Amino acid sequence: YDFGRDQTKDKKPGSVFVKSVRKGEINWAVITVILRVKDQDSYGSGKTINIPSPYGDSFTYMGWSLITSTGSNQYKLRVKTGEHYDANGFGKIGDRYVIACTPTFGKIGDEIDFVLANGRVIHGVMGDEKNMSDAGCNKWGHDGGHSVVEFVVNKSMWYHTGKTVTRFHPEW
């Protein structure tokens, strides 16, 4: 991706630029969400959701092994994909980070791209759905909407360690 512009591109033949509309904040960066339907060929060909300020200003994480309801789509996705992690313990499906977010952004298995104001793109796949009935959850996420993106991680590598998402990805 060309992160030096106000637009992002996947460099695939016939692909169009997707202009980032700058709404909402994530720490120091403004965030736009570009949704892709699974197995689409062109980047950003799904719908765009603009996250309003002050939502989305923190990242959280959860252990992938905590998804234990065998009949759920979350569990089926975890088993089907083999529960793979990168060297830092982030859950990965292919080249995408496994994330949890509210149904505002899609359903289990959907590919979701979060475009930050600096042009960086967090390429995610929805591996868990945040519970809208949880105290403090709204349509954007937990903690009153401040936690829009929750990364799914290797619980044994992350819990009780003081690790943070931005420790491994300060560019976010």
What is each model feature region?
Residues 1-38:
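Extracytoplasmic soluble-region selector
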Residues 39-172:
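Solvent-exposed, well-ordered loop and adjacent helix/strand elements within mature globular domains
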